[in-house]
Every structure is written in structure tokens, then in C-alpha cells.
Amino acid sequence: MHAFELPRKYKTIYICGSFGLAGSREKDLETLRHCYSHLEDDGALLLNIEAEYTSSESWNLWLPEHRQAMPQPWPEKGDARVASDGSEHFAQFRIVDVDPLEQSYTRQVRLEKWSNGELVASEEYTLRGSIYFKHELLLMLKVAGFREITVHGDYTDGPPTTDQEELVFTAIR
């Protein structure tokens, strides 16, 4: 998202659950700048981030004893998702590193496609993500040029609370 160039401008851009996956904070800021440049005047950028502190599973990964146990083992394959062609798809995820000082994590993803009991495709890759809190993202949006910025919790009309799992930002160009 940090390097896209599109031939026109948009009234709305929505980043759903993927902000912070550009690989670095610099690239994340560049993503916001690109979004700003691809919006019409008075256009809106909407994006959501997880409130890490609402999940004990996520928050505990910041503790030394949990970081020292990384990388996490691959989870069991679990149930397949069956596609319309009958093929079965498996996805596995694991955390291999969390850096509380840099507010970042590294996750590995393993995907498999099976057809008639045979593995026909597989891929494995690594994602580096950044963890953001409300005020840091507000500042980044201002630096990117946005003027009116509101924050809501869990896709409601009200302001966020400390118990809501998602923060939803609306930033106007």
C-alpha cells in the first residue's frame, strides 16, 4: 500500500484490518500519504486497528517470558475451508517475534491447497507488522496532511472506550 499509484482520485478509501503491515513505520506513514494524495478534496480515509491491550493473548506476548518462548510452534492444521471446486484450503499462522520497544511483531503464514487428497499448492511467507496506539496514529494522520480526524470504537457512532477491540479512524482530506 505504501507504493501504489492509481490513475484517479477517490471519495473514500477503506483500509480494513491491514494497516501496519507495510513492514516498517516509515512505509506505514508513506501509505497514509499515498492515501491522502489519492483522495478527492473532502474525501475520507477509513481504517481500523486492533486495540492490542484488549486481548490477553496479544498483550501477554509483550512479556519477557512469552517472548523467550518464540518462535511459537505451528498450530494444528485444523479444519479445511472447502472451495466451490471442492478443493480444501488450510491456513496456519504463528508469531515468531514480538518487540515491545519497537511495537512490532513478525508472523509466519503457511497456506496449503489440497485436491482429491493431494497437495497441489503451498506457500509460506513472513509478515512484519507494526502495532499502533490511538495517539500515535492520530499524529501520523496529521503529518500525512489529514485535517478532520475522528475515532470510534468497534464500528459504533460513539467514541472508543478502553474495552472496545477495534479503533476506527475517519480522516478527511
Task: Give a label for each model feature.
Residues 4-13:
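A short acidic, Gly/Pro-enriched loop at the edge of an enzyme's catalytic core
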Residues 20-24:
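A short His-aromatic
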Residues 15-19, 48:
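Residues lining the SAM
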Residues 13, 62-66, 167-169:
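Short, hinge-like loop/turn segments at secondary-structure boundaries
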